[in-house]
């Protein structure tokens, strides 16, 4: 759970208290460019300090590389956008704007259109930072599992990096487990009755549908494909309780 600037909340006659029951974030740290850079540097410093303690001489980006073929393809798309901008066909104010904004969504769209679908790789230091959404624990816990998996694969050989495939598998599994565990936790906390069970079911469905809609927007041709918030414009059928 993430709550912004809330100190406590009641739950089944018990008190929710940080940091045990939820993680607190300031939303501007997730969406503000400067705050994102600060958070990224903060994580980078943590990773590199920990690498030094286990005698690994590497920076965070080298230790957590993105899938090389993915980087190459995205860079090609970026160059196409930069070339279009130089011809006066771009949307952004600067040459890099469209390249940075649309290249990755276009790459994901390209993957989804293939008959034999290749999967997008959730790998690379910067991507893992973004996925953690401003919560340090959501970066470090998967990283710990990646490191252990790499140790097994290396079979005693020194670890100089985490394979992009290991990063991707761990992140995908963590995401599935996180979604599942949150609802299992919620089901244990609420009173067992049909009303609460139905509300949990509706909440799960809402989150699933929102995710599907956000994915559709990401693959669309809209000028802005990143969605941070939403509103319900017609709440006539929404349960008020």
Language model features with spans:
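The catalytic "switch" region of P-loop NTPases
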Residues: 1-117, 166-196
């Amino acid at each position: 759970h993430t709550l912004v600037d809330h100190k406590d909340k009641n739950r089944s006659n018990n008190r929710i208290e940080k940091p045990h029951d939820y993680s607190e974030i300031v939303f501007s740290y997730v969406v503000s460019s400067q705050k994102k850079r600060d958070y990224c540097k903060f994580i980078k410093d943590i990773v590199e300090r920990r690498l030094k303690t286990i005698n690994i001489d590497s920076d965070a980006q080298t230790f957590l590389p993105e899938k090389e073929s993915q980087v190459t393809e995205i860079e090609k798309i970026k160059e196409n956008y930069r070339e279009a901008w130089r011809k006066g066909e771009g949307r952004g104010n600067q040459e890099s704007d469209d390249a940075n904004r649309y290249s990755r969504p276009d790459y994901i769209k390209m993957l989804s259109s293939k008959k034999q679908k290749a999967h997008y790789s959730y790998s690379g230091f910067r991507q893992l930072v973004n996925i953690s959404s401003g919560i340090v624990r959501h970066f470090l816990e998967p990283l710990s599992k990646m490191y252990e998996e790499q140790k097994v694969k290396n079979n005693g050989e020194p670890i100089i990096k985490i394979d992009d495939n290991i990063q991707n598998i761990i992140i995908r599994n963590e995401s599935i487990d996180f979604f599942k565990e949150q609802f299992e936790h919620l089901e244990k906390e609420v009173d067992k009755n049909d009303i609460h069970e139905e509300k949990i079911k509706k909440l799960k469905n809402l989150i699933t549908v929102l995710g599907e809609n956000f994915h559709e927007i990401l693959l669309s041709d809209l000028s802005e494909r990143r969605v941070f918030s939403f509103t319900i414009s017609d709440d006539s059928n929404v349960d008020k309780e």
